[in-house]
C-alpha cells in the first residue's frame, strides 16, 4: 500500500507541476503583450510630444545635410530600436537578442 501512496503522490505532484507550467506560460504571454503595448505607448507618447513641440514653434527645423526620415519611418525606427521587427514578415515580433534584420533596415532606411 505504501508504494501505491507514493505513486499517487507523484501523479498529484506531476499534475500540479503541469498546471504551474501552464500558468507560467500564460503569465509569459501576458508579459510579452504588456511589454509590446508599453513600447507602442512610449513611441506614441514621444510622437505626441514632438507634435506638440512643433505646434508651439513658429518655424520649422531645417535639415543639417543628413538624410532626414519621415515621421512614419522615425516611428518604425523607434520600434526597431526597442527590439521589435518592423518588416512585413515578422512585424511586431521581438528580435532575438536584438539581432539586426536586413528586411527591417531596408524598410526604414531604404529608398521609397
Swiss-Prot record:
Q: Where in the cell is it found?
A: Cytoplasm, Nucleoid
Q: Name one GO biological process term.
A: DNA replication
**Cofactor binding remark:** Binds 1 zinc ion per subunit.
Sorted alphabetically, which InterPro entries does this protein's record hold? YabA
The protein's matches in Pfam families, at most eight in alphabetical order, are given as: YabA
Specify the superkingdom.
Bacteria
Which keywords appear in this protein's UniProt record, sorted alphabetically? Cytoplasm, DNA replication, DNA replication inhibitor, Metal-binding, Zinc
Is Cytoplasm there in the keyword field?
A: yes
* Subunit structure, interactors included: Homotetramer. Interacts with both DnaA and DnaN, acting as a bridge between these two proteins.
Protein's name in the database: Replication initiation control protein YabA
The primary gene name is yabA
Amino acid at each position: 500500500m505504501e508504494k501505491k501512496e507514493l505513486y499517487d503522490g507523484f501523479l498529484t505532484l506531476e499534475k500540479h507541476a503541469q498546471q504551474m507550467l501552464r500558468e507560467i506560460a500564460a503569465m509569459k504571454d501576458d508579459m510579452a503583450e504588456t511589454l509590446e503595448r508599453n513600447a507602442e505607448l512610449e513611441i506614441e507618447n514621444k510622437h505626441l510630444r514632438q507634435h506638440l513641440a512643433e505646434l508651439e514653434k513658429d518655424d520649422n527645423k531645417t535639415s543639417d545635410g543628413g538624410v532626414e526620415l519621415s515621421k512614419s519611418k522615425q516611428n518604425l525606427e523607434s520600434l526597431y530600436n526597442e527590439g521589435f521587427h518592423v518588416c512585413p514578415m515578422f512585424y511586431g515580433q521581438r528580435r532575438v537578442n536584438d539581432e539586426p534584420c536586413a528586411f527591417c533596415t531596408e524598410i526604414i532606411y531604404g529608398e521609397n
